[in-house]
Amino acid sequence: MSLNATEKAAIVAEYAQSEGDTGSPEVQVALLTTQINHLQGHFKAHIHDHHSRRGLLRMVAQRRKLLDYLKGKNVDRYGALIGKLGLRR
């Protein structure tokens, strides 16, 4: 349930800070959020898929770490990102 190249390129273009930016926390969090949202649909149909659930939990933890890093570095960018992605915090 990974993203195809066009979806990934669209997300990178939307959240990149500059041309060719693929490693900024905003881009990484946006990609992880999209993958997490795709997997939520998978788990509605496959409730007992515990192996994939472990991968989902790793993605959620990685996203949390990146958000904490961004919050420590620049609170304004953090607030803008969670508002744009519709995350709870």
UniProtKB/Swiss-Prot annotation:
Q: Which domain of life is it from?
A: Bacteria
Q: Which Gene Ontology molecular-function terms are recorded?
A: rRNA binding; structural constituent of ribosome
Query: What is one term from the GO cellular component aspect held by the record?
Result: cytosolic small ribosomal subunit
UniProt keyword terms in alphabetical order:
Ribonucleoprotein, Ribosomal protein, RNA-binding, rRNA-binding
Fetch the Pfam families from UniProt: Ribosomal_S15 (PF00312)
Q: Which SMART domains match?
A: Ribosomal_S15
Q: Which InterPro entries match?
A: Ribosomal_uS15, Ribosomal_uS15_bac-type, uS15_NS1_RNA-bd_sf
Q: Name one GO biological process term.
A: translation
Q: How does it assemble?
A: Part of the 30S ribosomal subunit. Forms a bridge to the 50S subunit in the 70S ribosome, contacting the 23S rRNA.
> Which family would the database say this protein is a member of?
Belongs to the universal ribosomal protein uS15 family.
Q: What does this protein do?
A: One of the primary rRNA binding proteins, it binds directly to 16S rRNA where it helps nucleate assembly of the platform of the 30S subunit by binding and bridging several RNA helices of the 16S rRNA. Forms an intersubunit bridge (bridge B4) with the 23S rRNA of the 50S subunit in the ribosome.
Q: What is the protein's name according to its record?
A: Small ribosomal subunit protein uS15
